[in-house]
């Protein structure tokens, strides 16, 4: 049984979050949680919360056994960017893009 959890509009770029997602793809959830706990990146904390949510969803909604679960799929898509202005010298301005991403984790017992 596949169970999904999503974090939409996560305040990190998809490029940075994909680095973390690649670490746990296909792993058992216990191993994935351990990897994320000791990964020193902001995106690791965001991905860990989504993974914990997916585990809780599987346990509560589907009655799955946590020991059998693995990360079947994990992907990070780009969300909308917030446009901001940074003043520069001589009256000019640069546009800053504050990027967001959509993190999706699918856990499965097979």
Curated annotation (Swiss-Prot):
Keyword set, alphabetical order: Ribonucleoprotein, Ribosomal protein, RNA-binding, rRNA-binding
Record GO terms (molecular function): rRNA binding; structural constituent of ribosome
Protein function: This protein binds specifically to 23S rRNA; its binding is stimulated by other ribosomal proteins, e.g. L4, L17, and L20. It is important during the early stages of 50S assembly. It makes multiple contacts with different domains of the 23S rRNA in the assembled 50S subunit and ribosome.
Species of origin: Actinobacillus succinogenes (strain ATCC 55618 / DSM 22257 / CCUG 43843 / 130Z)
Pfam families noted in UniProt: Ribosomal_L22
Record protein name field: Large ribosomal subunit protein uL22
Origin organism lineage: Bacteria, Pseudomonadati, Pseudomonadota, Gammaproteobacteria, Pasteurellales
Domain of life of the source: Bacteria
NCBIfam families assigned: rplV_bact (TIGR01044)
Assembly with partners or alone: Part of the 50S ribosomal subunit.
Alphabetized InterPro entries for the sequence: Ribosomal_uL22, Ribosomal_uL22_bac/chlpt-type, Ribosomal_uL22_bac/org-type, Ribosomal_uL22_CS, Ribosomal_uL22_sf
PROSITE patterns linked to this entry: RIBOSOMAL_L22
PANTHER family attached to this UniProt entry: CHLOROPLAST 50S RIBOSOMAL PROTEIN L22-RELATED, LARGE RIBOSOMAL SUBUNIT PROTEIN UL22M
GO BP annotation list: translation
GO cellular component: cytosolic large ribosomal subunit
Similarity field: Belongs to the universal ribosomal protein uL22 family.
């Amino acid at each position: 049984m596949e169970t999904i959890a999503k974090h939409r509009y996560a305040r990190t770029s998809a490029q940075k979050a994909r680095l973390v997602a690649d670490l746990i793809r296909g792993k058992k959830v216990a191993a994935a949680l351990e990897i994320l706990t000791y990964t020193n990146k902001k995106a690791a904390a965001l991905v860990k919360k989504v993974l914990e949510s997916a585990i809780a969803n599987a346990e509560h909604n589907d009655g799955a056994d946590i020991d059998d679960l693995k990360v079947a799929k994990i992907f990070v898509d780009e969300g909308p960017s917030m446009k901001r202005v940074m003043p520069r010298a001589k009256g000019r301005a640069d546009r800053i893009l504050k990027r967001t991403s959509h993190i999706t984790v699918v856990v499965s017992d097979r």
